[in-house]
């Protein structure tokens, strides 16, 4: 047994490789950003070959800079941006089109057409746990087949393969030998029946997707195949853990108990609550998804997704040019006592849960002569907490109980002002763990469990520890007034681009 597990964390803006030891210590990290492609308004793409080269490059780099040898690696785990859709030629390995990213809204018109069939829309929700939305993979595959010359003909001949990013990476790591996904990633395609654990023929046929394109669905923790580290004649290392980024974060936060929840503050915000073996269908705009599948035992989760979370700070930095570094946002936000009545609604690509409005667009409200740069920066930061609170409120109603505490992770969870405001506006205890690399850690856990590197979930759970706790300080009247202002702002951006 080797001394380490490697997590490959393929995100929306960068690819990372992180080496963990048995005590969950980070031995080494390598990261590389890659190109964001915006061909038209509301469209977002990545180059699949750049996803692969950046991911494989950081794997080689982290091994080199830590002097960890391939035979010291027990397993590789993969976590990935979900829903992002890649279609490639199985004979040449060449993508037929760029990866269509989860944020991309190009299929909104396809979704509108599908929504006209009320019975079908209800069928999708009842069987996939998802809502009909351009966010998920299904309509993205349809778009590629309908719009890329020759794609549909090739697909119908069995020459094209579909995969979310996990599938693409495993296929590349195994030199095209293995075409698989796991339960969690399959559950984000809008094509997978999460009750019966199978690709849903009714939905696939409605979208005109040949079943030969679809990967085999496996557990989130099992050996899928091996990759050669160290070139020809190198060490064969098992790829043995795989789950979507948010499910990995839930697992990395050791939210193993029914009712436990976490929020990841990344490019978007993603709130997940473990509902155990119960498939809870939301009445409040959340989606139902698979939390994890181990030994063919499925656990479900309620999920709320915010499309623009930490990305609003990138916008403040890159487009407004109010700050030089994302970390500066806290410094400038603290220069004012409050938002001064200013609200930023960052609906740049529409609104996710619980609103699901593809046509909403971003706006700044409440500006006066006294409003300055710092108020806007603070309002942008606060928008992340307001959107999270919308999800918490919906989740409490669906689950029938208020969350006692919220475990947090992701880059923006290091922002003390944001975390305190989250506790205040949500009237909830916010807990930040010592290890905030919970997404990568979750992938490492899943891979390690499959090969006996860690013995059990119980062993893993004992390792979770709090770095900082934030308790609510707002009076009820203040909290309600601020939330009312937020709701007012959101109501004004809905349907803007219709």
UniProtKB/Swiss-Prot annotation:
Sn-glycerol 3-phosphate binds at residues 12, 82-83, 135, 245. Homotetramer and homodimer (in equilibrium). HAMAP family: Glycerol_kin. InterPro entries: ATPase_NBD, Carb_kinase_FGGY, Carb_kinase_FGGY_CS, FGGY_C, FGGY_N, Glycerol_kin. Pathway: Polyol metabolism; glycerol degradation via glycerol kinase pathway; sn-glycerol 3-phosphate from glycerol: step 1/1. It comes from Clostridium botulinum (strain Eklund 17B / Type B). Key enzyme in the regulation of glycerol uptake and metabolism. Catalyzes the phosphorylation of glycerol to yield sn-glycerol 3-phosphate. This is Glycerol kinase. Activated by phosphorylation and inhibited by fructose 1,6-bisphosphate (FBP). Its EC number is 2.7.1.30. It catalyses: glycerol + ATP = sn-glycerol 3-phosphate + ADP + H(+). It is an enzyme of class 2 (transferase). One of its GO terms (cellular component) is cytosol. Keywords: ATP-binding, Glycerol metabolism, Kinase, Nucleotide-binding, Transferase.
């Amino acid at each position: 047994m080797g001394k380490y597990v490697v997590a490959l964390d393929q995100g929306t803006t960068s690819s990372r490789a992180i080496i963990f030891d048995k005590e969950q210590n980070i031995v080494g990290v390598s990261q590389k950003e890659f190109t964001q492609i915006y061909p038209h308004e509301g469209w977002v793409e990545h180059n699949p070959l750049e996803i692969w080269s950046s991911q494989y490059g950081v794997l080689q780099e982290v091994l080199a800079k830590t002097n960890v040898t391939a035979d010291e690696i027990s397993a590789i785990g993969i976590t990935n941006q979900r829903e992002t859709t890649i279609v490639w030629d199985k004979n040449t390995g060449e993508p037929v089109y760029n990866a269509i990213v989860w944020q991309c809204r190009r299929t909104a018109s396809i979704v509108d057409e599908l929504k006209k069939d009320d019975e079908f829309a209800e069928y999708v929700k009842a069987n996939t746990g998802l809502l009909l939305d351009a966010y998920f993979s299904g309509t993205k595959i349809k778009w590629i087949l309908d719009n890329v010359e020759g794609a549909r003909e090739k697909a119908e001949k069995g020459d094209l393969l579909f995969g979310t990013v996990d599938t693409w990476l495993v296929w590349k790591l195994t030199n095209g030998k293995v075409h698989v996904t796991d339960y969690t990633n399959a559950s984000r395609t809008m094509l997978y029946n999460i009750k019966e654990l199978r690709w849903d023929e009714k939905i696939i046929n409605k979208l005109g997707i040949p079943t030969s394109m679809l990967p085999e669905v496996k557990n989130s923790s099992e050996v899928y195949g091996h990759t050669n580290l160290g070139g020809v004649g190198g060490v064969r290392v098992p790829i043995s853990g795989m789950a979507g980024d948010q499910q990995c974060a839930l697992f990395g936060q050791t939210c193993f108990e029914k009712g436990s929840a976490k929020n990841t503050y990344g490019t978007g915000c993603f709130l997940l609550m473990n509902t155990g073996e119960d498939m809870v269908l939301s009445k409040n705009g959340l989606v139902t998804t698979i939390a994890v599948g181990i030994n063919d035992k499925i656990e479900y989760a309620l999920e709320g997704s915010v499309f623009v979370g930490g990305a609003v700070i990138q916008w403040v930095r890159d487009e407004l040019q109010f700050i030089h570094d994302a970390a500066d946002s806290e410094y400038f936000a603290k220069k004012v006592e409050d938002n001064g009545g200013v609200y930023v609604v960052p609906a740049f690509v529409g609104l996710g849960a619980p609103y699901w409005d593809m046509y909403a667009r971003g706006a700044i409200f409440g500006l006066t002569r006294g409003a300055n740069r710092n108020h806007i920066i603070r309002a942008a930061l606060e928008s992340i907490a307001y959107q999270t609170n919308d999800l918490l409120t919906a989740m409490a109603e669906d689950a029938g109980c208020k969350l006692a505490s919220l475990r947090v992770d992701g880059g923006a969870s290091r922002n003390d002002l944001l975390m305190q405001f989250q506790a205040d506006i949500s009237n909830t205890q916010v807990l930040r763990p010592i290890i905030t690399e919970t997404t990568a850690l979750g992938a490492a856990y899943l891979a390690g469990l499959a090969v006996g590197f860690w013995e059990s979930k119980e062993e893993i759970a004992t390792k979770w520890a709090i770095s900082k706790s934030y308790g609510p300080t707002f009076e009820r009247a203040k909290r309600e007034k601020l939330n009312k202002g937020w709701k007012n702002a959101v109501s004004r951006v809905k349907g803007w681009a219709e």
